Regions:
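Interhelical loop/hinge segments that connect adjacent transmembrane helices in multipass membrane
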Residues: 125, 129, 168-209, 213, ...
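Helix-terminus/linker motif at the lipid-water interface of multi-pass membrane proteins
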Residues: 10-24, 87-88, 144-146, 205-236, ...
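Membrane-water interface segments that mark the loop-to-transmembrane alpha-helix transition
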Residues: 1-9, 31, 36, 40-84, ...
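Membrane-interface junctions at transmembrane-helix termini in multi-pass inner-membrane proteins
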Residues: 48-58, 107-131, 153, 174, ...
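Alpha-helical transmembrane segments of multi-pass membrane proteins
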Residues: 37-38, 77, 81, 91-114, ...
Length: 330
């Protein structure tokens, strides 16, 4: 299922790259980075807290969901009202007509919490099916709209449908469904766990997105589109890695001692290395043909960044499991 999800997502991006012009991807990259700041702030580590909590109750899930949903809705409104000012500061006023739908995306992302309940219970099949159906729905919508000439809106609406459908199915599959209830005494340990993680998430956001903001501000949407696609395709191997982490992290969280945890860390790193190095070698050797015949001639300016990002993605995939170890220790 993991491979199928990545294949469908990558295949959709490949089709969209052939149907749309690079500037559409540049607009998406800039806006998803700007709006993503609000989305990251709304994620206070509730999902990770649920996975690592040894004696999770319905009230715990209710408290986490209620708090993060309220924060998410508030930040979605903040983006809706403040996007014009933010884009003006960044001198990207031309993107304002595309900004409003991202407020819906910010809010919908807060409905993903039952996925972490499924993963805590090691029900990865249900979690993966929900994620796959979200990817499939978003892909179908995006390609359909692109064929109808909707341009960048095909990418934005596809993103929203992906979040919506995934949320619907994780709620369907989860036996424990969070409710709108809040208990302050249960929020205290959650906040102690989540706030440091939220601060870390902001640094992660900066790490992954500041380059899009810089490229988009000082270059044009087309050049940012080249950069985005060059970055996007190599990092499908990191999508595989993140899905591996959905298995590795709960397993690490269940270890009884540091020795067992270290054995798991070494084994996970070993297999991640084998998975990462093969595409790296292939892209270095055959990158020109992959871009020309896969994406199309219009994407040839993305070749060198594509090769560089593939190597960087491989290195990151090999070294990422320290983060799972850190979280598993609470």
């Amino acid at each position: 299922m993991t491979a199928l999800k990545t294949l469908v997502d990558a295949g959709c991006q490949l089709v969209l790259a052939r149907l749309l012009f690079p500037d559409a991807f540049g607009i998406l990259a800039f806006l998803i980075s700007a709006a993503g700041f609000f989305c990251y702030i709304a994620d206070l580590g509730g999902g990770k807290y649920i996975i690592q909590k040894k004696d999770l109750t319905q009230e715990d899930a209710d408290t986490v969901f209620t708090f993060e949903l309220l924060v998410g809705v508030g930040l979605a409104l903040a983006w809706l009202l403040g996007a014009g000012w933010i884009l003006h500061i960044l001198k990207k006023n031309t993107l304002l007509p595309y900004a409003a739908p991202f407020s819906l995306w910010i809010a919908l992302e807060r409905f993903q919490l039952p996925r972490f309940i499924l993963e805590k219970r090691m029900e990865f099949g249900k979690s993966n099916i929900a994620t796959f159906l979200g990817i499939l729905a978003g892909s179908v919508i995006s390609v359909f709209l692109a064929l109808r000439g909707c341009g960048v809106y095909s990418l934005i609406i596809g993103l929203i449908f992906r979040s919506l459908v995934t949320a619907l199915f994780v709620w369907h599959y989860s036996d424990m469904k969070p409710r709108l209830k809040f208990r302050a005494d249960l929020a205290a340990p959650y906040m102690r766990f989540g706030l440091p993680l939220a601060v870390t998430s902001l640094f992660v956001f900066y790490y992954w997105n500041v380059d899009y903001i810089i490229v988009g501000k000082f270059l044009n949407d087309t050049q940012l589109g080249y950069y985005y696609i060059a970055f996007k395709f190599p990092h499908y191997i990191l999508q595989l890695q993140s899905l591996v982490s959905t298995v590795v992290y709960p397993a690490f969280a269940r270890t009884k001692d540091d020795e067992q945890l270290m054995r798991g860390f070494k084994l996970a790193t070993k297999y991640s290395s084998a998975l990462a190095l093969l595409p790296c070698v292939g892209v270095l050797a055959l990158g020109e043909g992959i871009v020309r015949y896969g994406l199309g001639e219009k994407w040839m300016p993305a070749l060198r960044p594509f090769q560089i990002f593939t190597c960087l993605a491989a290195v990151r995939m090999i070294t990422i499991h320290w983060y799972d170890v850190y979280l598993s220790k609470g």
